[in-house]
Amino acid sequence: MREIVSIQCGQAGMNQVSTAFWSTITDEHGLDADGHLRPDASSLESDRLDVFFNEASNKKYVPRAVAVDLEPATLDAIRSGPLGHIYRPDNLISGESGAGNNWAKGFYTEGAELMDSVMDIIRREAEQSESLQGFQLAHSLGGGTGSGLGTLLLTKIREEYPDRMLSTYSVLPSPKVSDTVTEPYNAVLSFHQLIDNADATYCLDNEALYDICEKTLKINRPSHQDLNSLIALVMSGVTTGLRYPGQLNGDLRKLAVNLVPFPRLHFFTTGFAPLFAKNSRAFHNLTVPELTQQLFNPANVMAACNPYHGRYLTISTIFRGQVAMKEVEDAIHTARTKYSPYFVEWIPNNVQTSVCNVPPKGLTTSATFIANSTAVQELFERTANQFSVMFKRKGFLHWYTGEGMEPVEFSEAQSDLEDLILEYQQYQNAGVDEDEELMDHEEYADEGVEDFN
């Protein structure tokens, strides 16, 4: 089997997002809360269980997951939660003091002290795999543990497993939903590591997730559970081709090869359809063209950037349910033609489609959208600007230098992110003649969502 080891780091990555992900895929693969196959589980559901689960004694399936946090409360919440019995107990590793929203504590001091024990567990999971394809990390870039310890783990895994794929689901901080003043520092220092050590980074942020919950799902006061359920939908959709047999479905490497034209440009935005309010039945059975229309709607992007402010380098779509490949290809071709000014001209065949006949629970059809768009630079620019304001006046810098960091590390991380922004701008403008076509389609960028309703 082509196994994937999942690493859950920090409160956002571990207790919340990953719990929602495991809840989703245990249900999709016919497992109960204790990891046993339900009597009604189909062979299709159980056929590729080994990718994300390891069969233990008594026919119990245990997630290939390592959960790490620098304070014990998060792990205690996992143990006492609805999936507490499914994890391997010694794969839950915690410190005692927390990271205090400080990247340096996660990367250099508190996190570094846990590194040997965490890597021992990761090695054991890798050794128990017949043909390990790679790792996926779920973490937040705003706090101290997910950002600092999470990216430290990436560097260690990259050193030890240089030929394995590393994917991350990274929750970016956003000014409208801010937990701590040091988030811009933590995020920029994390990007510096993600640029060098990740093969694919799925960018998500709470601002976009809140907007989807409020405007599309009609939830008045979205909870963290609501946001995490959205991320779990995306993680489930992205990993569909890894977990089920299907048409044109590949592995982590094939997905990255199709989406990443240049190694540093591996930051993706995602979307999911259908999204609808709980009391609405209108979208439960969308056609393939309707699903495709939702995928290209900027209101469905789970990161706070507008794809029509940039250009698509590459796209991958994953449709689920009893849909014909020809119908999917026709719908995508129509959308590709309609929005052609928003695709770069110099990458041929830059839209990949795949179909899995197993729909998500509770739906007859669904679709997941992965885009490598130059518009992702909006996320980077926002964070870089906030970083610059703080760094110029050396705000809170002593919290980091007190953990052994040097100011030059901040400057290097800042320069690396600014270089990345310039690279996205360069490839956005390559081959564009005075942006004439874009000017003719300006209404998509200006009006945004209205064109899709």
Curated annotation (Swiss-Prot):
Localisation: Cytoplasm, Cytoskeleton
Record Gene3D superfamilies: Helix hairpin bin, Tubulin/FtsZ, C-terminal domain, Tubulin/FtsZ, GTPase domain
Keywords noted in UniProt: Cytoplasm, Cytoskeleton, GTP-binding, Magnesium, Metal-binding, Microtubule, Nucleotide-binding
InterPro entries reported for this sequence: Beta-tubulin_BS, Beta_tubulin, Tub_FtsZ_C, Tubulin, Tubulin/FtsZ-like_C, Tubulin/FtsZ_2-layer-sand-dom, Tubulin/FtsZ_GTPase_sf, Tubulin_C
Domain of life: Eukaryota
GO cellular component terms, A-Z: cytoplasm; microtubule
CDD domains referenced in this protein's UniProt entry, alphabetically: beta_tubulin
Complex and partners: Dimer of alpha and beta chains. A typical microtubule is a hollow water-filled tube with an outer diameter of 25 nm and an inner diameter of 15 nM. Alpha-beta heterodimers associate head-to-tail to form protofilaments running lengthwise along the microtubule wall with the beta-tubulin subunit facing the microtubule plus end conferring a structural polarity. Microtubules usually have 13 protofilaments but different protofilament numbers can be found in some organisms and specialized cells.
Entry GO MF terms: GTP binding; GTPase activity; metal ion binding; structural constituent of cytoskeleton
PANTHER family, per the entry: TUBULIN
Residues engaged in binding GTP: 11, 71, 140, 144-146, 206, 228
Primary location recorded for the protein, binned into one broad class: cytoplasm
Name used for this protein in its record: Tubulin beta-2 chain
Biological process according to GO: microtubule-based process
Organism per entry: Geotrichum candidum
Binding site for Mg(2+): 71
Biological role stated in the UniProt entry: Tubulin is the major constituent of microtubules, a cylinder consisting of laterally associated linear protofilaments composed of alpha- and beta-tubulin heterodimers. Microtubules grow by the addition of GTP-tubulin dimers to the microtubule end, where a stabilizing cap forms. Below the cap, tubulin dimers are in GDP-bound state, owing to GTPase activity of alpha-tubulin.
